[in-house]
């Protein structure tokens, strides 16, 4: 059983408010053909569990096939552009992440407008960050890690899943609030970054739990702290570890092409809310270290505005530029 908290109550209020309107106004024929979920990352990544879960549940609810279409590359721009060019009829969904608000802050010539070419439907997941190190790192706490990093300026290499990705920005926020100067080693995807961390070629990563929890449990990696991650019992939060200013998370959410009718958006949001607030869904995702974070269109839009400022401030101070 999951206790009723403010997030659950807010989600229930949201659903109660939009369900009658959505059912009354959404076109009766929608959906009238297969639905495609575009995922801007390779198969097996942290977005796959929720993509396939909601795909299965939408098929059960609506009787239409749902195709998960992984289109990795271009720092998520390939899948995002494909979504922007799709008919605005609710049959193409973009399962996106924090990168959606980060890319415009780093890339001057995006082939789409992240704000004007899309409409928000719902947030689904929030993924907290954990500071994870190779066992050879002589630090068992965040404060010991900070002291070590300060004693060897640029001497601790940290991995990221790509230049300008959310975990790169998370590491730079850590540098800013801890006063450290770690050296960035970007990879083309989280899988290779974790493999090199396992081999000791890099010493640290700021990762969502999905990709590292099995290695932490096996003792191949060590977690020093997290921002509130499910699935890491016994590991302190950054606040408990004496670094409350390190507060950042990534998210996964559904967007649709601009021009999609509001009744279609409401019908989608209503069904997604039912799926994400189902205790069975929450249990399945918690097992992967992911926490349900359902918000409807308006709350999602407000959150993106706040994140644009927060990520923008970190990027500006760190002077992060696309290479």
Task: Name every feature range the model reports, one short phrase each.
Residues 1-13:
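N-terminal secretory signal peptides and thylakoid transit peptides that target proteins
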Residues 24-116, 155, 179-204, 208, ...:
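N-terminal (or domain-start) structured segment
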Residues 85-91, 105-192, 238, 251-284:
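Hinge/capping helix and adjacent helix->loop/strand transition within the periplasmic-binding protein
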Residues 95-100, 160, 170, 190, ...:
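Beta->alpha turn/N-cap motifs
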